[in-house]
């Protein structure tokens, strides 16, 4: 283990149109919907960061990966085979069979697949990052936290905006068009069109081009109207977000790497923004709609219906050996996903002795994933019998259907004095049917029709043909208890206990199953539910010119879902015995002058796996305990920002970020 330190200094000046008519001597209030209701951020007893849509636009943040750089204990990383969302180090591994530990909730609809984390962020009202398990209101599987995204809504007054920008270093161009206003006396509309193109910044010497290249188009249309007492909002969106190449290099060769890849087959491993890799690209198409209806009930409460449909297709060509040599070039991967969901909930009017939310949720989804992996000519250098594998390939087909329903509720009970008790729970039932089939093909090679094909794939690459299908059903109950105390009108303390769960499922990427002939280490098929227990203590305060919040947390995970490299070509999916994490988050704002604001955030995290069931070659064993520090976890995060309003059209901000990473 070693410590890698890096420190970044960022200076930026951004020009934009400033909407508020004048400066104010009080700190602007941040409104969030972390508990469904609109509340001031400082009144919500949850560790949450909220980023306004205007702030996202002003900083040219175009996706969650860019946004995560300024949010404590939140990290989004796009890799060649997956996109990972991590809160407090909790994330799903690079296996499409895992449910997302940190689901996206976009306008009330769950976007549960990792590929959807690449959705462009444009024309938004706000983005909220909720840390810690959030099962009650954001659904089963939100075991690490949740990301809530709210799009800007249609307006009664006409609004029009067009912006375009160019960045010369990376050859990036972005354009945004927004039109909003009344279409008739009872119908409002909003249209958002965004495009982005980028040339990249890493030289791929093998492909003779700059990477990663981006080409994104996003269109969103909304209609809002009232029929009787019911308010409706219909959102339809479509997007194409494509990329060529990836922002990654081969670094830090270990063991005998430099001896094997030497001479004419040398692989460049310097940290110099240069890589050597085969063809890689990703093509993604998304089509969604959401219909939201709010019906005011007698007594002041609101009955809400949210009907959603999410559909996307993904096609990718990968070079999974990550080097310019023809080993596993031309790997094809496709994914098709289709989801329908329906939520109905009742929200009490608020401000009473007991404020509550109750509801029910139903979701049905289908996913189909294919993999095609050919073996390249580089293996010919190994000589027979390994060289006989050149030109052979495998096809892997996976299909899954699932149905889930849940009921949930949360109540805030105002006790005597300044005490407040919050009780919440969600009960869920989910059924899944899955199948996976892997076949080997030696057509056009010396192994066509020969039993030696299976022998060599198993002996050299630990891959074996198989055909498996099964069903599973599981129930979960996730409770939450929170006690809050108002120290004054402007400050509070709270402590909470939450249990969360993430559904089990089937291994999409397995290369074999138990009982597969000839393989040296059989892969898995089914994995079980993951569970978490989280305890938090927090403090929040606000005044006219300052706000501050602090959260300390400790979380224990049981049956943690993991994906461990098998030492050859694949990954073995299973459940680790336990993991533990603890740390803190704090963030604050202070209005230094009428036009000068200071912002600071800091986070610390200690995350370790314990009592590991499935051990890889790099695991260090200690007496009665196994410790592994997870990746994508900053041990220490620090962000300092000073923002100054120079005039009505110019804003200047200085930003310093720093992280201490344990690897």
Task: Show the residue positions of the predicted features.
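Periplasmic-side early beta-strands and strand-to-turn transitions of outer-membrane beta-barrels
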Residues: 148, 156-158, 165, 177-278, ...
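Outer-membrane beta-barrel translocator/receptor signature
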Residues: 85, 100-101, 113, 122-131, ...
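Acidic, small-polar-rich N-terminal luminal/periplasmic segments of exported/outer-membrane proteins
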Residues: 27-157, 537
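Conserved C-terminal beta-signal and adjacent last beta-strands/turns
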Residues: 24, 180, 334-347, 351-359, ...
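Repeated loop/turn-to-beta-strand initiation elements of outer-membrane beta-barrel proteins
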Residues: 158, 186-189, 229-232, 300-303, ...
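Structural signature of Gram-negative outer-membrane beta-barrels, strongest in the C-terminal barrel
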Residues: 224-226, 346-349, 361, 398-556, ...
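Membrane-embedded beta-barrel scaffold of Gram-negative outer-membrane proteins
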Residues: 288, 292-296, 302-318, 486, ...
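Gram-negative outer-membrane beta-barrel transporters
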Residues: 356, 417-421, 547-557, 574-649
């Amino acid at each position: 283990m070693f410590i890698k330190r890096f420190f970044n200094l960022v200076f930026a000046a951004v020009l934009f149109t400033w909407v508020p008519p004048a400066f104010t001597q009080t700190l602007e209030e941040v409104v969030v919907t972390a508990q469904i209701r609109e509340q001031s951020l400082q009144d919500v007893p949850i560790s949450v960061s909220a980023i306004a849509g205007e702030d996202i636009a002003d900083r040219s943040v175009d996706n969650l990966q860019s946004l995560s750089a300024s949010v404590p204990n939140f990290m989004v990383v796009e890799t060649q085979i997956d996109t990972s969302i991590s809160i407090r180090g909790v994330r799903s591994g690079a296996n499409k069979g895992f449910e997302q530990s940190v689901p996206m909730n976009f306008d009330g609809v769950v976007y549960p697949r990792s590929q959807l984390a690449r959705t462009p962020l444009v024309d938004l009202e706000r983005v909220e990052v909720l840390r810690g398990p959030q099962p009650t209101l954001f659904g089963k599987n939100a075991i690490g936290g949740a990301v809530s995204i709210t799009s800007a809504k249609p307006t009664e007054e006409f609004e029009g905006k067009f912006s375009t920008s160019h960045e010369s270093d990376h050859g990036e161009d972005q354009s945004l068009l927004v039109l909003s206003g009344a279409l008739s006396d009872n119908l409002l509309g909003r249209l958002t069109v965004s495009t982005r193109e980028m040339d990249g910044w890493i030289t791929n010497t093998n492909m003779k081009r700059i990477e990663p290249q981006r080409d994104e188009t996003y269109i969103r249309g909304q209609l809002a109207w009232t029929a009787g007492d019911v308010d409706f909002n219909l959102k339809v969106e479509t997007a194409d977000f494509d990329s060529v190449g990836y922002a990654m290099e081969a670094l830090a060769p270990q063991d005998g790497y430099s001896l094997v890849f030497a001479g004419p087959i040398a692989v460049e491993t310097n940290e110099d923004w240069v890589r050597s890799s085969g063809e890689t690209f990703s093509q993604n198409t998304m089509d969604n709609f959401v219909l939201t209806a709010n019906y005011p009930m007698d007594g002041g409460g609101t009955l809400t219906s949210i009907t959603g449909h999410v559909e996307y297709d993904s096609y990718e060509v990968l070079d999974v050996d990550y080097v310019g040599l023809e080993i596993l070039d031309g790997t094809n991967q496709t994914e098709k996903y289709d989801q329908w969901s329906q939520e109905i909930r009742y929200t009490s009017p608020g401000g009473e002795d007991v404020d509550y939310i109750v509801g029910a949720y139903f979701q049905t989804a289908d996913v189909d994933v294919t993999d095609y992996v050919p073996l390249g000519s580089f293996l010919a250098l190994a000589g027979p019998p390994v060289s006989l594998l050149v030109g052979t390939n495998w096809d892997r087909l996976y299909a899954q259907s699932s149905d889930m329903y849940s009921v949930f509720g949360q109540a805030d009970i105002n006790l005597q004095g300044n005490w407040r008790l919050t009780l919440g729970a969600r009960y869920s039932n989910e059924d899944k049917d899955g199948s996976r089939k892997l076949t080997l093909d030696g057509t056009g090679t010396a192994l066509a029709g020969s039993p030696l094909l299976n022998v060599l794939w198993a002996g050299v690459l630990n891959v074996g043909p198989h055909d498996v299908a099964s069903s599973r059903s599981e129930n979960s109950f996730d409770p939450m208890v929170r006690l809050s105390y108002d120290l004054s009108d402007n400050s509070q303390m709270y402590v909470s206990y939450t249990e969360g769960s993430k559904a089990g499922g089937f291994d999409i990427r397995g290369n074999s199953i138990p009982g597969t002939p000839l393989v040296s280490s059989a892969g898995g098929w089914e994995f079980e539910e993951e569970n978490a227990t989280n305890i938090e203590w927090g403090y929040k305060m606000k005044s006219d010119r300052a706000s501050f919040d602090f959260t300390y947390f400790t979380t224990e995970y049981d049956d943690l879902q993991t994906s461990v490299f098998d030492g050859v070509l694949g990954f073995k999916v299973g459940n680790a015995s336990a993991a533990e994490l603890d740390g803190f988050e704090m963030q604050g704002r202070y209005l230094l002058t009428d036009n000068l604001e200071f912002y600071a955030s800091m986070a610390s995290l200690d995350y370790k796996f314990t009592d590991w069931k499935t051990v890889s070659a790099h695991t260090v064993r200690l007496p009665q305990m196994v410790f592994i520090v997870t990746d994508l976890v900053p041990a220490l995060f620090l962000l300092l920002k000073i923002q100054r309003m120079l005039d009505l059209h110019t804003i200047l901000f200085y930003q310093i970020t720093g992280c201490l990473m344990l690897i």
